[in-house]
Amino acid sequence: MYGQKNELLGKRGTKIMKFGALYSYWGHEWKCDYIETAKKMKKCGCEVLEIGASHLLEMRDEQLRGLKATCDELGMEITSNIGPSKEYDLASEDPAVRANGVKFLADIMKAMKKIGSKSLVGAMYSYWPCTDFKFDEKAGAWDRSIEAMKEVAKVAEDLDVECCLEVLNRFETYILTDCDEAIEYCKRVGSKNVNILLDTFHMNIEEDNLPDVIRKAGELLGHFHVGEGNRKLPGMSKGAMPWAEIGEALREINYNKCVVAEPFLLVGGRVGADIKVWRDLSNGADEEQMDKYLAESIKFLKEKFVE
């Protein structure tokens, strides 16, 4: 029965990973009907719905209650994904912009409490996509971002929210582009509520060895995004990504949090433009086939990641 138990347990009765996907999977725009999307994801085997965090500030309390009630009934966890715009840049040279960013993230975390979401994930340390930076400004940007993130961390600690900082690639940010940088950044922030989000798509561009990077992150790994090197669903590009070895590394560090697919298969709309999807990666799939792709990928991930 839905809602009675939403944690997968391993053979020894210990909590293990839960699997899900980003809300935008079926769409061309950064919006959706969250209740219907949650139901569709549940039918595909998902245990996690990753929403757009900024949408929470646009939703009425009754809408937030409805989303929470639906996900509680389905036994689904909600994680909240953020890629702030430039007006909320924590690394900005303008103190007013940094203060605006801290307030923005604090307001989001307060809204997250209303739906029971405890994970805020993404490139909240700056803005996304970040395209107008200069290398010789990086040290100062780091200092500003870290000081602002310390303020965000205080709110996260008060609200029991985990902030997971996404390590991106060189084309989307200059703040955190590999795991070593993320570890150093988190150490400088110095909060148990600020950890790392690794994403196999970005790792495949920037890291030398994906399983070893997971081991390096260790207990700092708070969230994990998965996708093939071309942003297809895990398992769609046969042999391109070392999924079994990635799963082994996750088990070695006793990772027991969320694994969220972040696939982008469709051309068109704001999503296609922002993610740079210039050709159809779905093989002309209709909605039913898209459902099947997701269900097969979730099954694939569980087989590779869970003993």
Q: For each of these PLM feature ranges, what is it?
A:
Residues 2-4:
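Low-complexity, intrinsically disordered or signal/transmembrane-proximal segments
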Residues 7-9, 15, 33, 72-74, ...:
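Active-site acidic/histidine proton-transfer and metal-coordination neighborhood
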Residues 8-25, 32-45, 116-118, 176-198, ...:
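Histidine-acidic metal/acid-base catalytic patches
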Residues 25-27, 53-55, 84-86, 126-128, ...:
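Active-site-proximal loop/turn and secondary-structure-junction residues that shape catalytic pockets
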Residues 50-71, 129-130:
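Glycine-rich, proline-tolerant flexible connector loops at the mouths of alpha/beta enzymes
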Residues 63-73, 151-152, 216, 245-249:
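Catalytic-core regions built around general acid/base machinery
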Residues 87-89, 128-132, 268-273:
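Short acidic/His/Gly/Ser-rich catalytic and metal-binding motifs that mark active-site loops
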